[in-house]
Regions:
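Compositionally biased terminal segments of proteins
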Residues: 1-234
Length: 234
């Protein structure tokens, strides 16, 4: 494994313990899959968060998200982390960059899709993640169906090697279950791009991303062709 990715993942676990503290957010995405569902087949270097409360009107929800991000930054700064919130847009503060010792991780909240299909649950790091990252962490995590329903949409939309790898793990284990399919449809319908653009995207050349933003992240060697095959089978 690449040492920078390993250091980033270790930093991520320390950051997560100071961000996911009061139920405002839950973890989703690749970090949820690879550190809390799978026994760490790859490292993860960012925190993708969901705002589980779907009952609040949009403006009220955004205010709560912004407030929670600012509170997280304050907690992190008290522990010696450097934080930077990118320039706020009309949605306010929904991203936070956290740095320590030359390593940086990104926190990002999905403010478009608020709420989850299934209830959030508390989850602990898998054994391999605990041992490798030298951490012990229990935090709110989106359901298996939610994380993979969203991941399938992300893999189709972004075609990033990390997303495609996560999909290969799903195909190798459970496959697309009824629950995942239902969550996928909901996340697809909630996407900010037209459905047909997500389902039938123009295929991107992902070789550069594979070499510079993926290689060295997995516990076992992965060939680009395997990820391209996963993309073709989605």
């Amino acid at each position: 494994m690449n040492q920078v990715y390993l250091d980033s993942a270790r930093l991520l676990t320390r950051v997560a313990s100071l961000v996911l503290v009061d139920g405002t957010f839950a973890l989703k995405g690749g970090t949820a899959i690879n550190l809390f569902v799978r026994d760490m087949p790859r490292l993860s270097v960012d925190l993708d968060l969901v705002f589980p409360d779907h009952t609040l009107p949009r403006e009220q929800a955004l205010r709560r998200i912004n407030e929670a991000i600012r509170q997280s930054a304050a907690r992190l700064q008290k522990q010696g982390f450097l934080t930077h919130a990118p320039a706020a847009t009309e949605s306010g503060e929904t991203k936070l960059m956290v740095r320590r010792g030359g390593i940086e991780v990104k926190i990002e909240v999905n403010f478009v899709m608020r709420g989850t299909v299934h209830p959030v649950h508390m989850a602990s790091l898998t054994e391999a993640a605990r041992d490798t990252l030298q951490a012990d962490l229990e935090i709110p995590v989106a359901s298996f169906e939610d994380v993979y329903g969203g991941k399938l949409v992300a893999a189709m939309d972004r075609q990033h090697p990390r997303d495609l790898f996560d999909v290969t793990q799903l195909f190798a284990h459970e496959g697309i279950t009824v629950g995942i399919r239902r969550a996928f449809v909901i996340y697809l319908a909630s996407h900010n791009r037209p459905v047909h653009e997500v389902l039938f995207p123009s295929l991107r050349d992902i070789r550069q991303e594979f070499e510079h933003n993926f290689a060295g992240m997995t516990t076992e060697p992965v060939e680009l062709d395997a990820l391209l095959a996963a993309r073709a089978s989605e």
